[in-house]
A protein has these predicted regions:
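Active-site/substrate-binding loop(s) of hydrolase catalytic cores
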Residues: 23-24, 39-41, 52-60, 67-128
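Acidic/His- and Gly-rich active-site-bordering loop/insert found
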Residues: 23-44, 48
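Hydrophobic alpha-helical segments and their boundary regions
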Residues: 15-16, 36, 72
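A generic local structural motif
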Residues: 29-32, 61-62, 127
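Short glycine- and acidic-rich boundary segments immediately preceding or forming the N-terminal edge
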Residues: 1-32
């Protein structure tokens, strides 16, 4: 079994890319469902903070290089494309999406960019 895609095919994302919406500034929101998903499969997120783009570059290289049939986890390459484009930690609304996902331990506070309630931001609602 081949682990990597041929170099000539690595310019494009592998087949199976799905759109789940558009960002506030109109960027496509895409995810890569795992062809080899199971009950143990997880979700890999990158690009949550737009000013931390190394995860997007690394994950993009992995998606373009690895054979899709080996991918056991679902992938969202860039949760916050507007923040990545603008070089901001937050999204286009000024919300830190990492502090906005619904969680049992979510609480209000003085954390940078925290919003008023969990899962209020449309970018997070589209993902959950």
């Amino acid at each position: 079994m081949t682990v990597t895609r041929p170099r000539a095919e690595r310019g494009a994302f592998p087949p199976g890319t799905e759109h789940y919406g558009r960002s506030l500034l109109g960027a496509p929101l895409i995810w890569f469902p795992a062809p080899a998903a199971s009950r143990e499969s997880g979700l890999i997120l990158a690009g949550t903070h737009g000013d931390e783009n190394s995860s997007v570059v690394t994950l993009s290289c992995a998606l373009r290089t690895l054979t899709p049939s080996l991918r056991r986890h679902h992938v969202v390459l860039c949760v916050n494309p507007d923040g990545c484009q603008l070089g901001l930690r937050a999204n286009a609304n000024g919300v830190d999406l990492n502090r906005n996902f619904p969680a049992a331990n979510w609480k209000e506070g003085e954390t940078v960019y925290r919003w008023n309630s969990a899962a209020e931001e449309r970018d997070v609602v589209l993902l959950t």
